[in-house]
Amino acid sequence: MKIANNWKDYKILDMAEGQKLEKWGEIILSRPDPKIIWKEKTYPKKWKEINAVYHRSKTGGGAWEFHKKMPKQWQIKYKELTFNIKPMGFKHTGLFPEQAVNWDWMMEKIQKSKRKEIKVLNLFAYTGGATVACLAAGASVCHVDSSKGMTTWAKENVVSSGLEKRPVRFIIDDVVKFVNREIRRGNKYDAIIMDPPSYGRGAKGEVWQFEENIYDLVELCTNVLSDNPLFFLINSYTTGISSKVLEDILKLTVNKKAKGTVTSGEVGLPMENSELVLPCGIYGRWEK
C-alpha cells in the first residue's frame, strides 16, 4: 500500500463508527467512510472539536451539520501546491488527500525525465489535483471533465498555486468523445491520468459505468499515446474491483504498445499518533 504520509495541512485525527475525523488546515470535519467498521474511538476528546459533520441519509445523499462557525472556503497546501477546500453535497471537499502519493510519483517522473516538453492528458480530472501537480513539475496539461463547476474549481486551484502562466487547456466534455476527437486530430500525449467514477454521466448525459467501459477507454487511449510515453495512471474507488484488474488491463493495452513496468496496489491515509491506516482506493501504473 502507498501511504500519503507527507501532509502537513491534512490529518486524520481519529476513526470510529463509520466516521473519519479530519483536520483540513485549521478546520475539523467528520465525514462518513464505509470502511471504518470498528466502534472504538482512540481519542474521544478530539471529536468535541468538530466544525462540521456530514450525516448520510438512509434514503441516499445527506447533509452537513455545522457545530462551529467556519469559512465557506479555505486553502490547504501540499508541498508547493495550494488547493481550495469547500464542503459540498455528498460529503466531498474538493480534494482526495490520498492522491498525494500519485502526485509525488508523477512529479518525480516528469522532473527526472529531463525532457524539454511533456504533454499530459488528465481525464475525469475533477478539481485538478493531478493537473496542478503536473504543471508544477514542468509539464503541459490537457484537463478534461464533464462538470463545468469542477472545471472552474480546477482553474482556481491552478491560480492559487501560482501556475496560471503554465500551459494548460481546460475541456468540458465527455471523456470518450474527447479522446475520439483527439485521435482524429492526430494529437498525442506523453502521459495519461484517469480517475473514472464507478458511475457517471458525461456533459450531454452520456452514461459511464466502470466495469463496462474502463477496458475500452484504456485501449482507446493507447491511440493518443506518443511514441515515447512516460507514464499511464488509472485510479479507482469502485467497490469490488481489485487493483490487479487495473494491472491486467494495462498489461493487455498500454504495455503492448510500449514495453514498460506495470504495478498496482492500494492507496491509504495514516491516522495521526496511531498505527492505523485507512484504505482509500486503488491504482494501476504503467511507466517507462
Question: Can you describe what each PLM-predicted range is?
Answer:
Residues V175-N255:
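S-adenosylmethionine
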